């Protein structure tokens, strides 16, 4: 049986700020239902690549396709439809501090759907329950922990039932236990919803726990050095930079592998 067609295809992508090139000649694909890790050292362009994938930055050259359809060659209306398929969890959680958790999650539902207020309340309760925050509808972001804010941000990212989820450093600022719980939640959501998940992270425990595949970006050569299963890259890559990155603190992360 042939493998499924890629959910996301990156073809000959060059990312730049004006004449300053961040990464060039990026070509890889992401399969449906895969948890794909964007990894590499500081300053390599991980978050810049994420901004390209969610339509916030236009490539200097190259293309990004979703289910075979070019994002930037599409009409504005078609691009808007593609964007509706995305859910994004930003590093800070990006919750509105003046709104309750319920109001934060209801915001995109009121903006982009025709659901009644009662139906919106039901969806909000369901999304909060999915991330373990049932009963926290009336809490404000400042009243809950950092890990809970990340989960609330994830609930909002799932509000419109996206089939592609993007996470920017989801474990940033979390203690190891909260980080592991968030990893478990990401796996559970992928398995239950069948979503494709793209994660920017430098956390080895998360990379090895949730990553099915990934791309390694190098800040020195300004291009990708490899694509593949992070554990396989750690164990068999001939590239010293990849082995060094993925074997940091190996003693602490052996159990996560």
Which residues does each predicted region cover?
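Catalytic Walker B motif of ABC-type/P-loop ATPase nucleotide-binding domains
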Residues: 165-168
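A short, proline-enriched helix->beta-strand linker immediately N-terminal to the Walker B motif
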Residues: 159-163
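Helix-to-loop junction immediately C-terminal to a conserved catalytic motif
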Residues: 54
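Conserved ABC transporter NBD signature motif
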Residues: 62-71
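Conserved ABC ATPase signature
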Residues: 140-144, 148
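Conserved ABC ATPase "signature" region
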Residues: 117-136
């Amino acid at each position: 049986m042939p493998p499924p067609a890629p959910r996301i295809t990156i073809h000959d992508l060059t990312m730049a700020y004006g004449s300053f090139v961040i990464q060039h000649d990026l070509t890889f694909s992401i399969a449906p239902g895969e948890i794909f890790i964007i990894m590499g050292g500081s300053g390599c362009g991980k978050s810049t690549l994420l901004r390209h994938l969610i339509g916030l930055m236009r490539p200097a050259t190259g293309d990004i396709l979703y289910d075979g359809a070019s994002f930037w060659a599409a009409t504005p209306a078609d691009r808007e439809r593609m964007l509706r398929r995305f859910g994004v969890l930003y590093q800070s959680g990006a919750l509105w501090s003046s709104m309750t958790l319920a109001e934060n999650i209801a915001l995109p539902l009121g903006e982009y759907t025709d659901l009644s207020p009662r139906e919106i309340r039901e969806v909000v309760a369901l999304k909060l329950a999915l991330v373990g925050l049932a009963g926290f509808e009336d809490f404000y972001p400042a009243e809950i922990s950092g890990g809970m804010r990340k989960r609330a941000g994830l609930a909002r990212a799932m509000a419109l039932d996206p089939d592609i989820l993007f996470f920017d450093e989801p474990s940033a600022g979390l203690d190891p236990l909260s980080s592991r719980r968030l990893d478990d939640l990401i796996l559970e959501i992928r398995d239950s919803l069948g979503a494709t998940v793209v994660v920017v992270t430098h956390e080895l425990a998360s990379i090895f726990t949730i990553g099915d595949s990934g791309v390694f970006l190098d800040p020195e050569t300004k291009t990708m050095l490899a694509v593949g299963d992070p554990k396989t890259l750690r164990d068999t890559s001939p590239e010293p930079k990849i082995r060094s990155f993925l074997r940091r603190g190996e003693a602490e992360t052996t159990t996560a592998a």
